[in-house]
Amino acid sequence: MESLRIYNTLARDKQVFVPRQSGEVRMYVCGITVYDYCHVGHARMLVVFDLVQRWLRAIGYRVTYVRNITDIDDKIIRRAVENGETIKSLTDRFIGAMHEDESALGIQRPDIEPRATQFIPQMLGMIETLETNGYAYQASDGDVNYSVRKFTNYGKLSGKSLDDLRAGERVAANDAKEDPLDFVLWKRAKPEDPEGASWASKYGMGRPGWHIECSAMGCSLLGNHFDIHGGGQDLQFPHHENEIAQSEGATGETFVNYWMHNGFVQVDNEKMSKSLGNFFTIREVLERYDAEVMRFFIVRTHYRSPLNYSDVHLDDARASLTRLYTALKDVDADTLALDWNEPHAQRFAAAMNDDFNTPVAVATLFELAGEVNRTRDASLARQLKQLAGLLGLLGREPRAFLQQASGAAQAGGLAADEIEAKIAARVAAKQAKDYAEADRIRAELLEAGIALEDKPGGSTEWRRV
């Protein structure tokens, strides 16, 4: 099997993956700020790094996968105040909702899922170290800031220079900062802050800035220097750039070897966002589409490419997934282990080892499905099912998927008992030699999105199309 190569944002190139410790991978991914339901952009991040950790385990690595939860933040505080509830009540509710969405999408839970509020002492310890090392200062407004000019490698991840940032970026003026680009490590508490929004420290009551949260949790749980750090493309700057400055300023060590960033979700070639009104939650999508269809829609696009969201693309994903399940129908896949020497498995592995190239891996699944359709071979069916399983797909019985209704069908289509009743009426018509009526019922069902397949022995099976 070829070596795994990962596109490293830091190097701006694909690199052969070499873990710091042989056979072990330590990976940190920036998770979700929990003040609302997860949206399609969150779904992409969740699925992408679920695929990454699944593949790392599949090729024999022992993985420690950490994905954090940001449970203290300006948006969280504002939403809790608006709702008239405590911060903990709000965040607990949306953490629960996030876990429900994850389960629906077939996301395997990370090994460790730290909440920011569980690591306040570690954050304060890192801030104090940065102050001792000359990277941090307490400003006149009580905030503790990071002095970006003190970190000579600032911009190495994003390729942005401080001079270019000062000249071209709009930076909010703040007279208390030594430099407009300095960012906050510790926010001084405000009189109007609700209960649960601040902690005691040598700098006074306050709370951590967003960037220090991930630095402290990553270093505390995985060590000062670990293998992979991931997140959405929008986090590359300033969040991940600031994480590097904080972590390396505090420890004097390289923070992370490989930086991975998944691409944006777009609607009509514009980034999905609330401000543009083209924003969809996972739950809204799952009202109309099966969760595995949504997962397949995400999986079949390379993780670094833009993902264009539309009903047309989801409908196509549903039709494509239906083709894969149809190939497995009526074939009893054997239960032997996956054969990595089989040609399709080799092509699949080569694709996944080429920076997790899921479009090519999925194309290999369709090649294999074609072979299964042609030969009805149990060993090939097993290969198809097991390779797809590495992507979190084809885990159900084919008939269960083919007969399940999408949200839209559940809302306006025929229920299973209605379909069975019409099939029984068609059988009765055929027995009475009323073939015109039997054909009419078949056509009526097809118009309703139900395809019939008459089997030897007189039985009839159905699936949604």
UniProtKB/Swiss-Prot annotation:
Instruction: Name the enzyme group at the top EC level.
Output: ligase
Cofactor(s) the record lists: Zn(2+)
**Residue positions binding Zn(2+):** C30, C214, H239, E243
Please, one GO biological process term? cysteinyl-tRNA aminoacylation
| Entry's cofactor comment | Binds 1 zinc ion per subunit.
**Residue ranges annotated as motif 'HIGH' region:** 32-42
Q: Where does ATP bind?
A: K274
Entry keyword annotation includes Aminoacyl-tRNA synthetase: yes
Q: What Pfam families does the annotation carry? A: CysS_C (PF23493), DALR_2 (PF09190), tRNA-synt_1e (PF01406)
**What GO molecular function annotations does the UniProt record carry, in alphabetical order?**
ATP binding; cysteine-tRNA ligase activity; zinc ion binding
Instruction: Describe the reaction catalysed, as an equation.
Output: tRNA(Cys) + L-cysteine + ATP = L-cysteinyl-tRNA(Cys) + AMP + diphosphate
Q: What is its EC number?
A: 6.1.1.16
Q: Where is this motif: 'KMSKS' region?
A: 271-275
Q: In which compartments does the protein localize?
A: Cytoplasm
An example of a Gene Ontology cellular component annotation for this protein is: cytosol
The record's annotation in SUPFAM superfamilies points to: Anticodon-binding domain of a subclass of class I aminoacyl-tRNA synthetases, Nucleotidylyl transferase
Ordered alphabetically, the record's keywords are: Aminoacyl-tRNA synthetase, ATP-binding, Cytoplasm, Ligase, Metal-binding, Nucleotide-binding, Protein biosynthesis, Zinc
NCBIfam families membership: cysS
Q: Read off the PANTHER family from this record.
A: CYSTEINE--TRNA LIGASE, CYTOPLASMIC, CYSTEINYL-TRNA SYNTHETASE
Protein family: Belongs to the class-I aminoacyl-tRNA synthetase family.
Quaternary state and interactors:
Monomer.
- HAMAP family with a match to the protein in the record: Cys_tRNA_synth
Can you name this protein?
Cysteine--tRNA ligase
What is the species listed in this Swiss-Prot or TrEMBL entry? Burkholderia cenocepacia (strain ATCC BAA-245 / DSM 16553 / LMG 16656 / NCTC 13227 / J2315 / CF5610)
